[in-house]
Amino acid sequence: MNFYDVQITTDLGEIVVLQVCAYSESEAELTAISMVENGEANVMGTYVTGCFVLG
């Protein structure tokens, strides 16, 4: 597994950057999107090791 930095822009225009541990870039992106959509982006755990909101 590798660490990937995934940047997502929400519907409100906020930029969220998650550091996700995953087997591939696409898996990291899907995990990050799911976490943001479910309101779990601030939950540190097995897959998400860092979360930053830029604006």
Question: What spans do the regions from the language model cover?
Answer:
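Short, mixed-charge low-complexity intrinsically disordered segments
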Residues: 35-55
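A short, exposed loop/beta-hairpin motif centered on an aromatic-Gly-Thr core
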Residues: 14-25
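Compositionally biased, intrinsically disordered low-complexity regions enriched in proline and serine
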Residues: 4-5, 24, 48, 53
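Short aromatic-glycine-(Arg/Gly/Cys) micro-motifs in beta-strand/loop hairpins
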Residues: 1-16
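Ampipathic, surface-exposed secondary-structure segments
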Residues: 1-4, 34-38
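Intrinsically disordered, low-complexity Ser/Thr- and Pro-rich stretches
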Residues: 4, 18-19, 41-44
